[in-house]
């Protein structure tokens, strides 16, 4: 098994053949008009143009692929949730109906733990430990909007192989819920994150930094990120004086 996250690809032996798969950065939404009742492990129409950049990178990574030929080009759908986390637990509007779905292509490796947790949940009447990050009840009605799903689904698949930086924010389907203070916070230099669809100020860019040409945007890193010093200043201001937080 070979994974190359920077190229969104994985390679493995499969039934005596060599399989190349990918989690591309700009996925194509499918099923927006509904999924047929009889759809089960079916194949979608081939889309060589969409896969071509992935294939070119694969040939560059493993030159032998240039002469290997393609035995089967399989284009199939995969289920990804709007926040790349499971849908697990008792359905909020249907008593004793439990769900384990939306595993975002990590279902096999998650099956043992998720199955155990769900079984204990069903038996004990409550989650065996804090599972809110994957609890189906976190989903909101607006996340069933066609427009929202089309935009967000293009992003979520590619994030599987992207760097999972701390505090990483979704880039698509944003700005859906804004508090009455939103524009005031934005004018004050706020950098927004998303909480249940709400735009929430995570930190503020000081005026002098803005004058130097800096922007109120995350610069993701595994090290100390660009907002750390600004958050330190905010922390001291609240600790030593007073602060007002918009918790919408």
Positions of PLM-derived features:
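Glycine/proline-enriched, intrinsically flexible loops and inter-domain linkers
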Residues: 129-248
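A generic local secondary-structure boundary/capping motif
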Residues: 8-9, 242
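Short hydrophobic-aromatic micro-motifs
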Residues: 10-12, 18-22, 200
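General beta-strand structural signal in soluble alpha/beta enzymes
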Residues: 20, 69-70, 99-100, 194, ...
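C-terminal catalytic lobe of FAD-dependent flavoproteins
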Residues: 6, 15, 29, 37-177
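Short, well-ordered strand-loop elements centered on a beta-strand within folded domains, enriched
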Residues: 17-22, 98-99, 212-217
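Catalytic strand-loop segment that frames the active site of acyl-thioester-processing enzymes
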Residues: 23-35
């Amino acid at each position: 098994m070979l994974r190359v996250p920077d190229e969104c690809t994985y390679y493995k032996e499969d039934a005596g053949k060599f399989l190349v798969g990918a989690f591309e950065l700009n996925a194509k939404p499918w099923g927006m008009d509904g999924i047929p009742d009889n759809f089960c492990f079916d194949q979608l129409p081939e889309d060589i143009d969409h896969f071509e950049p992935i294939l070119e990178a694969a040939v560059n990574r493993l030159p032998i692929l240039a002469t290997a030929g393609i035995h089967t080009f399989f284009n199939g759908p995969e289920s990804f949730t709007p926040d790349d986390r499971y849908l697990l637990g008792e359905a909020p509007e249907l008593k004793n109906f439990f769900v384990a779905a939306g595993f975002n292509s990590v279902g096999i490796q998650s099956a043992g733990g998720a199955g155990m947790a769900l079984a204990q949940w069903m038996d004990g009447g409550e989650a065996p430990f804090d599972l809110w990050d994957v609890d189906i009840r976190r989903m909101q009605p607006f996340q069933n909007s066609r427009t929202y799903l089309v935009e967000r689904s293009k992003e979520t698949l590619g994030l599987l192989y992207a760097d999972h930086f701390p505090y990483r924010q979704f880039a698509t389907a944003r700005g859906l819920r804004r508090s009455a203070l939103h524009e005031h916070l934005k004018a004050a230099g706020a950098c927004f994150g998303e909480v249940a669809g709400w735009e929430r100020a995570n930190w503020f860019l000081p005026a002098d930094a803005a004058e130097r040409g800096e922007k109120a945007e995350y610069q993701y890193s595994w090290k100390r990120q660009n907002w750390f010093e600004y958050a330190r200043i905010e922390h001291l201001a609240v600790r030593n004086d007073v602060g007002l937080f918009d918790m919408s």
